[in-house]
Amino acid sequence: MVSISVVIPTYNRLNFVVKTIESFLNQQSDDFELLIVDDGSTDKTEEYFTSYKHPKVTYHRIVNSERGFARNYGASIAKGRYVNFFDSDDLAYDNHISTALHYIKKLDNPEIFHLNYVYQTIDGQELDALKAHSDNIGEMLIKKGNVLSCNSVIIRKDIAAKFPFCESRLLSGTEDYALWLSLSSRFKIHYVPEITSVVIDHEQRSMASHDIIKMINRNMFLLDHLQADQHFMQYIGKQFNQIQCEC
């Protein structure tokens, strides 16, 4: 059994995902597995992975179902004690796994924690890094929106199984934010200051969509989704209005 399963959903991003995989094959620690979940790509992703062989990497193709389902599917077949959902267009530094393993031990097998990350342009220019601490991650999620990078969140597998991503296409691009809010009302999200991954800012990012109607509908669905979570609503109380403002 490995300690960490890295689940990488991908859709028509062969040119990106190959670089993402390469960044993981240069890790300081080899106590992990990579699960590539192909969400029904129509480019040459399937053709490429048919002949791709590496002991750390397994390829799984599913019918196109959006990222939430792809992530949940990956978690369901993961062999690790912890799961890391990593986007197929970003990069891991060589300390990503080793740092996660260090803090799993230091924090005594936490339910969830978040490593730090940096934004970078497609040509390698660093833009910004998250500045936070463990006592205010939940507050930041409420007041500042989705400050967490999915790439840097490490979740214990039993927690990932009990609290899956929403699989509705109506929440596509915000399903991770909905989950972080839900989890923050139940567990402490520990913050680790070490930077271990890079979020690449490019035009093809799904969260960069500028379709105003879709954004409005998605935000309305997010609020309805959160209101259906009684535990979360009891936890957040009147602060719920601040989430509405962020939307």
Please tell me what each predicted stretch does.
Residues S23, D38-E47, D87:
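A conserved acidic beta->alpha catalytic loop
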Residues K44, D90-Y103:
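Acidic donor-binding/catalytic loop of UDP-sugar-dependent glycosyltransferases
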